[in-house]
C-alpha cells in the first residue's frame, strides 16, 4: 500500500482551497462578532458520553470511538460541535441571561453524508442561549442568510419546518406516540403507503392530520391550508404563526414550507430552517431550535442556532481568494530588509525570490515589485 494514500472520503486541503476557506472563515466570524457573538473553542476529543447527549442514534453512528490510554475510558472524536457549545453554556459559563456563542473547527464522521462528501468537515456556526421567544430564531435565521450572502451565494432557497406540529399531534394520541419513530421515518421519507399503514387504526382526526403533512408543502400560502387541515391545537397554531414570521423576514430568498421535512426532529424542539443553493443537491446550512440540548449537562436552557461546512461552502462560493503580492529580491541589504519589514507591517504580502527561483510563484499573483531606485527601495507595478 502506498504511503501517500489517504482513507476514503478524506482529503488534504491544498493552498488555493485553504486560502479560500480561511477567507470565508474570517468573513463569517467577523460577521458573527458584529452581532455580538463570542467565540469558543471546544476540544476535538471528549469522553464519549459527553458528545452523545443529543442527536440520537445517527450521531452515535457518525462518531469515531477510541480508548483513552490514561483513563481507560472511551473517547469520541466530535462529529458535531453543537453539544460541546451547549456544555460550555450550561456548565462553564453558567450565565443567567442571553448568551451568544460562535465557533469554527474540524469535525470527523465515520461515514460520509453523501456520495462525494468529506468525512472531515470544518464546521462553523452560531448559537443563542437563554431566550425562548421567536426573536432568537429570527436573529439566527438572518445571521445564516447573511453568512451565505457574504460568501457570494445567490438564488438561495430557505426551507422551513416546525417540530412542534408533529409533537402536538403525537401528544394528543398515545397510540400514535408509541409509533413516533416509525411515523417520523415515514414522513421524512415522504413514504405515503407506509404512512397510511401506520395510521390506519388511529383516531380519525389524528389520522387525517398525519396523512395531510406530506402534502403541506409549497410557498408561505400553504400555511393557510395547514390551518384548515390540521387540528386547532394551540401548539400547532403557534408553530404555524412562527413559520409565517420566519418566512416574512426572509427577504430576497425563495421560501418553501414543508411540514413533513422532519430531518433532525429528534434533535429539534421548534422551528427548523435549511438553506439550499441552485445546482447543489445537499443542504448548505441547517439551523433551528433545540431547547433540550443542555439538559444532559444539568441546565436545559432555550437554544437556537445554525451551522454549515466551510469546505463545502468554499467549493461552491464564487469568492476569489487568490492573493496579490509584492515580489522582492533576496539580498543581504539592511535597507531592503527594512523596506520589506515595513511593507509586511502594513499588511502587504512580500515574497522574496530566493536565488535561482525568480519566476517560480505558483500561488500568488505578484502584481508589484520592490525595486531599488536612486538608493531607495520603492514599490512599482510589474
Swiss-Prot record:
One of its GO terms (molecular function) is histidine-tRNA ligase activity. Pathway: Amino-acid biosynthesis; L-histidine biosynthesis; L-histidine from 5-phospho-alpha-D-ribose 1-diphosphate: step 1/9. It comes from the Bacteria. GO terms for cellular component: cytoplasm. GO terms for biological process: histidyl-tRNA aminoacylation; L-histidine biosynthetic process. Gene3D superfamilies: Bira Bifunctional Protein, Domain 2. The keyword Nucleotide-binding does not apply. Its main location: cytoplasm. Keywords: Amino-acid biosynthesis, Cytoplasm, Histidine biosynthesis. Coiled coil: none annotated. It is found in: Cytoplasm. This function is generally fulfilled by the C-terminal part of HisG, which is missing in some bacteria such as this one. Heteromultimer composed of HisG and HisZ subunits. Required for the first step of histidine biosynthesis. May allow the feedback regulation of ATP phosphoribosyltransferase activity by histidine. Belongs to the class-II aminoacyl-tRNA synthetase family. HisZ subfamily. This is ATP phosphoribosyltransferase regulatory subunit. It comes from Burkholderia multivorans (strain ATCC 17616 / 249). The lineage of its organism: Bacteria, Pseudomonadati, Pseudomonadota, Betaproteobacteria, Burkholderiales.
Amino acid at each position: 500500500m502506498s504511503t501517500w494514500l489517504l482513507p476514503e472520503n478524506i482529503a488534504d486541503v491544498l493552498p488555493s482551497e485553504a486560502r479560500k476557506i480561511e477567507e470565508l472563515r474570517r468573513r463569517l466570524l467577523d460577521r458573527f462578532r458584529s452581532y455580538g457573538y463570542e467565540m469558543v473553542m471546544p476540544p476535538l476529543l471528549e469522553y464519549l458520553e459527553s458528545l452523545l447527549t443529543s442527536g440520537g442514534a445517527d450521531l452515535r453512528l457518525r462518531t469515531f470511538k477510541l480508548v483513552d490510554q490514561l483513563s481507560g475510558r472511551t473517547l469520541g472524536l466530535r462529529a458535531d460541535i453543537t453539544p460541546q457549545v451547549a456544555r460550555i453554556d450550561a456548565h462553564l459559563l453558567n450565565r443567567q441571561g442571553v448568551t451568544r456563542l460562535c465557533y469554527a473547527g474540524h469535525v470527523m464522521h465515520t461515514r460520509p453524508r453523501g456520495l462525494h462528501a468529506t468525512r472531515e468537515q470544518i464546521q462553523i456556526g452560531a448559537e443563542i442561549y437563554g431566550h425562548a421567544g421567536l426573536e432568537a430564531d429570527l436573529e439566527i435565521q438572518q445571521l445564516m442568510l447573511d453568512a451565505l450572502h457574504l460568501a457570494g451565494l445567490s438564488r438561495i432557497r430557505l426551507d422551513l419546518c416546525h417540530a412542534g406540529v408533529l409533537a402536538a399531534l403525537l401528544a394528543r394520541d398515545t397510540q400514535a406516540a408509541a409509533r413516533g419513530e416509525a411515523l417520523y421515518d415515514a414522513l421524512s421519507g415522504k413514504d405515503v403507503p407506509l404512512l397510511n399503514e401506520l395510521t390506519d387504526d388511529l383516531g380519525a382526526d389524528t389520522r387525517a392530520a398525519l396523512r395531510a403533512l406530506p402534502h403541506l408543502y409549497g410557498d408561505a400560502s400553504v400555511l393557510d391550508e395547514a390551518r384548515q387541515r390540521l387540528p386547532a391545537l394551540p401548539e400547532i397554531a403557534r408553530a404555524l404563526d412562527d413559520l409565517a414570521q420566519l418566512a416574512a423576514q426572509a427577504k430576497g430568498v425563495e421560501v418553501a414550507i414543508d411540514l413533513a421535512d422532519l430531518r433532525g426532529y429528534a434533535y429539534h424542539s421548534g422551528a427548523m430552517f435549511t438553506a439550499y443553493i441552485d445546482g447543489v443537491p445537499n443542504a448548505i446550512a441547517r439551523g433551528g431550535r433545540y431547547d433540550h440540548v443542555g439538559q444532559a449537562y444539568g441546565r436545559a436552557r432555550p437554544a437556537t442556532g445554525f451551522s454549515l461546512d466551510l469546505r463545502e461552502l468554499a467549493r461552491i462560493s464564487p469568492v476569489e481568494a487568490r492573493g496579490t503580492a509584492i515580489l522582492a529580491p533576496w539580498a543581504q541589504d539592511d535597507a531592503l530588509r527594512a523596506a520589506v519589514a515595513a511593507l509586511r507591517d502594513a499588511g502587504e504580502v512580500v515574497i522574496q525570490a530566493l536565488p535561482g527561483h525568480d519566476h517560480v510563484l505558483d500561488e500568488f499573483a505578484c502584481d508589484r515589485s520592490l525595486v531599488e531606485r536612486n538608493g531607495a527601495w520603492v514599490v512599482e507595478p510589474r
